[in-house]
């Protein structure tokens, strides 16, 4: 009885951590897609984009 409870607990913990890992991965991929989309939009010459000063770039990167 004791080892069945332990097994159930370990399985629940394992699947919970797996779920958290996939959630984290999903959020990171979403952020990367947003970052790539913003960069691609800024680099297209046809669009009006906000001009970034080189001295303000490092401050934006830090935030």
UniProtKB/Swiss-Prot annotation:
One of its GO terms (biological process) is mesendoderm development. GO terms for molecular function: transmembrane transporter binding. It is a single-pass membrane protein. It comes from the Eukaryota. GO terms for cellular component: plasma membrane. The chain crosses the membrane at residues 9-29. Keywords: Cell membrane, Membrane, Transmembrane, Transmembrane helix. Residues 7-29, 51-57 are annotated as: Important for interaction with SLC2A1 and SLC2A3. It is found in: Cell membrane. Pfam families: SMIM43. Interacts with glucose transporters SLC2A1/GLUT1 and SLC2A3/GLUT3; the interactions may promote SLC2A1- and SLC2A3-mediated glucose transport to meet the energy needs of mesendoderm differentiation. Required for mesendoderm differentiation. Interacts with glucose transporters and promotes glucose uptake. Probably augments the glucose uptake capacity of glucose transporter proteins to meet the energy needs of mesendoderm differentiation. This is Small integral membrane protein 43. It comes from Homo sapiens (Human). The gene is SMIM43.
């Amino acid at each position: 009885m004791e080892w069945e409870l332990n097994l159930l607990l370990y399985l629940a913990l394992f699947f919970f951590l797996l779920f958290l890992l996939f959630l984290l991965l999903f959020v990171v991929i979403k952020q990367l897609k947003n970052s790539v989309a913003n960069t691609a939009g800024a680099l297209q010459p046809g669009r009006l984009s906000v001009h970034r000063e080189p001295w303000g770039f490092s401050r934006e990167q830090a935030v």
